[in-house]
Amino acid sequence: SVSAEFMLTRFLGLGVTVGGQWLIVVEALKAQAICARTYAWRQIQGNAYSKYGAHVDDSTNYQVYNNTNTFESTDTAVNETFGQLLAYEGEPIEAFYYSTSCGHSTDGSVWGADPAGTPYLRAVSIDENAKELSLSSNEEFKAFIQNENSGAYDADAAMFRWQTTTDSTILSEKIGGVGRITGLTVTERGPGGIARTLKVVGTEGSKTFSSQSKIRTILGNPSLVYTRNADDTITGWDTLPSAFIYIENEGTDENQVTKFTIYGGGYGHGAGMSQNGAQGRGKTGK
């Protein structure tokens, strides 16, 4: 509808989602416009908020919206893709997107669903090859995540590579029942190397946590300081930026505090379109 197209121009102007630098490449904005329009269409059809006279809310449950102004570039992106949707076998898809990749995407199993239900969500490298890499072991993923020269489209994005240090005291704020925490190990990885299960070992037992969202939550803490790809730091996040992680045990000090370094990449769930990947690809003229 016309109202939906108008709201897309406001949505694409939203710095929270796109970021100022994203406004540079109009082709990337067009890709975002089509994804957002398809997402909106699916929510309208789902009608989950019918009792409120709405289709979505303006939280992270659906799409954050801060009533910002539009830009000429965002208006152009919406107008030049007017009415276009992403479809698979004639049906509009679940058009997922996220901020930044680690250089590889994952598939629909990231939310615990059968990936056969979303065959268009594929685990591939975010570069000109677009092939699935073997990243199922910790050794393979360690080599991948510690390589900053992968040739990925979003390699210049601030969150393409990041690392942080946590310890057993910080972790105990969210993880109890295992005593003093002495070990963290990713025991299963999904397509693209995303952490699927995490084993936490302590002096009095162990626990296993499953799903990327749960792993990001229990390992995250607002006190953690992240060193990012741009060699600056950021702090204050409740959860890890992504579950594309490798963890190294740094040993236990004289106070019996065990430290861990988390090497990570990307920001978001990793399924669908990387917004910064689209930006990087747009810069190449593709």
Describe the residue ranges of each PLM region.
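Conserved, single-site charged/polar hotspot
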Residues: 1-286
